[in-house]
Regions:
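N-terminal beta1-alpha1-beta2 submodule of the flavodoxin-like/Rossmannoid cofactor-binding fold
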Residues: 1-95, 100-110, 115-118, 208-239, ...
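Structural beta-sheet core signal
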Residues: 6, 93, 140-144, 183
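A short, flexible beta-alpha/helix-coil linker loop
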Residues: 10-13, 147-151, 188-192
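Short, structurally constrained coil/turn elements
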Residues: 33-35, 134-136, 175-177
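Active-site donor-binding loop signature of nucleotide-sugar glycosyltransferases
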Residues: 44, 145, 186-188
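Short, structured loop/turn "capping" segments at alpha-beta junctions
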Residues: 116-121, 136, 177-179
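Short, glycine-/small-residue-rich phosphate/pyrophosphate-handling segment
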Residues: 122-173
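Glycine-rich phosphate/pyrophosphate-binding loop and the adjoining helix
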Residues: 153-249
C-alpha cells in the first residue's frame, strides 16, 4: 500500500490556489491508478506549524531519556509531523513562491521535521560533514506556482530563485535524494496572459503524467509494505483518505 503525504503551504483558499489544484490533481490521478493508496493531508496554510523557539531547541538537543514533561510537550508537534513523514513513500509539497522563497509555514514545517535523533544524526567523528539523514527511499514531488517567470537554471531570474534550492537542500531530511525530486512549475501567474494559460496546461499535463508513472511503479512492485498508522490530530493532519473525486481544487 503506497502512502502519499500531501503538504499544502499556500495561504490561498482552494479556488484561488494553483498549487492546491495541482496537489489535488496529483493525488486524484495517483489514487485512480493505485486504489489502495493512503493519503495523509497536511495543510500548513490553514494550520501553520509553530516556529522553532528556545524551548524546542533545548528539548531537541536533550537525550530522550532525560527530557521532562515540559520538553516532551515542546516536541509534541514535531513528533506528529515526523510520524507522518516516516509513513510516506511519496511526499507531495504544494509550494508557491513567496518573495522568491518558500512560504513561512513551509519553512516552519521543515524546521519542525529536521530534528536530531529523528530525521538526522550528528557525529563529529565524520569530520566536516557530521550530519547524516536517518530517513531514505522517499520520492519528493514539488508542485509550485510563480507570479513571474524564468527561475529555472539559465533563466533570467535564476539568481532570485531561493525556493527550489532551499527545498533541495533540505530534501535529505525528508528521506529523498536530489535524484528523487520532481518539480513541476506554473509561471506567469501575475501576467494572466496566454503564457500563463500555456504554463498551467503544461504543468497540469506534467502532473498527471508524473502521478501516473509513480503510481504504475508502485503497482508493478507489489511490495505489500505495511506502514504505521497516523491518526487525525489537532494541527490539521488526517490520514486514510482514498479519493477518486471531490478533492480540493
Amino acid at each position: 500500500m503506497p502512502t502519499l503525504l500531501v503538504v499544502n503551504s499556500s495561504a490561498q483558499l482552494e479556488e484561488r490556489s494553483l498549487t492546491r489544484k495541482l496537489t489535488a490533481l496529483f493525488s486524484e490521478t495517483f489514487c485512480e491508478r493505485a486504489s489502495d493508496t493512503r493519503v495523509i493531508d497536511r495543510d500548513l496554510g490553514r494550520f501553520p506549524p509553530d516556529f522553532v523557539d528556545h524551548r524546542f531547541i533545548e528539548a531537541a538537543f536533550t537525550e530522550p531519556g532525560q527530557r521532562d514533561s515540559r520538553m516532551t510537550d515542546a516536541l509534541a508537534q514535531s513528533d506528529r509531523l515526523i510520524d507522518e513523514l516516516e509513513c510516506a513513500d511519496i511526499v507531495v509539497i504544494g509550494a508557491p513562491m513567496y518573495n522568491y522563497g518558500m512560504p513561512a509555514a513551509l519553512k516552519a514545517w521543515f524546521d519542525q521535521v529536521a530534528r536530531i535523533g529523528r530525521t538526522f544524526s550528528f557525529d563529529l567523528s565524520r569530520g566536516d560533514f557530521p550530519i547524516e539523514p536517518l530517513l531514505s527511499g522517499k520520492h519528493l514531488v514539488v508542485l509550485s506556482a510563480r507570479g513571474e517567470f524564468g527561475f529555472a537554471p539559465g533563466g533570467v531570474r535564476e539568481a532570485q530563485n531561493a525556493l527550489d534550492p532551499g527545498i533541495a537542500a533540505c530534501a535529505h531530511y525528508l528521506g529523498a535524494s536530489k535524484a528523487s525530486i520532481d518539480t513541476i512549475v506554473v509561471e506567469y501567474q501575475e501576467f494572466k496572459d496566454h503564457r500563463h494559460r500555456a504554463s498551467w496546461e503544461q504543468a497540469s499535463k506534467a502532473t498527471i503524467e508524473l502521478a501516473t508513472r509513480l503510481a504504475s511503479d508502485f503497482v508493478s512492485l507489489q511490495s505489500g509494505t505495511t506502514r504505521s498508522d497516523v491518526v487525525e490530530d489537532r494541527d490539521g493532519g488526517r490520514q486514510d483518505r482514498n479519493p477518486v473525486a471531490g478533492a480540493a481544487s
